[in-house]
Structures are given as structure tokens and as C-alpha cells.
Amino acid sequence: ELFILVDEDSASASEVVAGAVQDNDRGLIIGRRTFGKGLVQQQMPLGQGDQVRLTTARYYTPTGRSIQRPYDTSSRTDYYAEVRKRHQTGEMNDPSKIPINDSLIFTTPKGKKVYGGGGITPDIYVSTQETKDELWNDYIIGSNLIDLFVFLELDKNVKNFNFDNKQKFLNEELPNPNGFIESFAEFCKKNNLPIKVTKKNKENILNSIKAFIALQVYDENTYFKIANQNDKFVIRAMETD
């Protein structure tokens, strides 16, 4: 069976694919409501090196849903802040908070209801279920800060690792995990992005560090083997019959 994993950062082409799969009953969409970016723009020259991009079309799913969310009643700032507002309304933790327009409910060939109004609403919802501190930690882990930390740590302490056996690296935990946590917390503090380490997120931090080590030493495939172990979306897909 086909599962497509999406969240609020999924935009444009990924939404076209997710919408087509959902509308044709070919698979399940797992995650959270997507960004809602479905405009077609054409770049036109004005002369002297100047150019302007004109919106010439919109992307629609097979049932007729417009992927683009409304923007005509909001300012540019409000438009890009809409995803942040989903945290305020509770949508990130509760799918019942997703705004539904009754006039924009569509039906697939097999009778499943799908929803328009901007973005792709998933079939199976994955809640953030996170506090503000946890969301902040996720932001840091998702930034390039952890990648830089791993690069510097490997440069200084590569002698502490044995990378000859990839499978052994995958199966074993990092050497001196507490030392890694302390070093990363100090590194974040020096970069003015303090991270709060708790029992709950310690495993995620170590897993992310290990994944980025694998990316720099081995390859992208090994990175994802490690990173996906704690990925809520992947776990939910694996649990789905």
C-alpha cells in the first residue's frame, strides 16, 4: 500500500502528488495539513534586466480542489504567518480544529470525503503533541546547527570512532552519549540557540546526532535509516494496516 507523509511544510509539487493520490483512492495521506501553495507563475522580461512574475494558473486536484489557500483577504505578513497560527488555534494537536468549508467538500470515486480550501488534509492525522519547549528543540534539531556541530566534533574527535563496520555503527549507541549531550547543549548556547535537554528529548537529540554522523561518514541512505527510527510519521505509517 502507498503512504505519503506530509506536514505544514509540504508545499507545491508535493501537494500536487498527494492530492492526486488521495483523489484517485490510490493511497493514504499521513501527517498534518499541508502548506497550500498551488500557483503557476510565468516570468516575463521587462527590459534592462528587469523581470516580473505573473500568476497565470492554479493547480487543482482531480476532484477539483484548489491546492492554493486563500490570500486575497490577508496581508503578505499574515499569509506567511498562517502556519504559525495553526499552533494558536490548536490544529497542530487536534484535527477537529482544521477549518472546514462545507461548500468545499469533495468526494473521491470510492466515496471518500476530501477537503478543499487550501492544502491537502491528511487521511490519518499525526499530532505534534508537543510543548513550546519541545517545538523549540525540534526547530534546533531541524536547523543546520546540529550538522555543523557534528562536523566540528568529528574533526576534533574522529579517533574516538570506528567507522570500518557500518552495521556495527547502526546497531550500537554513540560512545559517551552524555558527553555528546553536554557538548551539544553548550554548542547551542554559544550560538544563542539554547536547548533544554529533558529525559523525553534526550533520545531524539542523540538519534539526530548519530544520523548526521552517518550522513557525513557514510551516505544519505544510512542517515535515513537512523533518523526514521524516531520519526512520528514513519512510525504511524508502519502501524497502519
What residue ranges belong to the model's regions?
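Hydrophobic alpha-helical scaffolding
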Residues: 3-11, 30-33, 45, 57, ...
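Generic hydrophobic-segment detector
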Residues: 26-28, 39, 54, 100-101, ...
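Soluble periplasmic/extracytoplasmic beta-strand elements of cell-envelope proteins
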Residues: 1-7, 20, 28-30, 51-58, ...
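Solvent-exposed loop/turn segments at secondary-structure junctions
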Residues: 8-12, 34-37, 59-62, 74, ...
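Short acidic-hydrophobic surface loop/beta-edge motif
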Residues: 42-46, 58-59, 104-108
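Conserved functional hotspot residues or short segments at active or partner-binding sites
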Residues: 66-67, 71-241
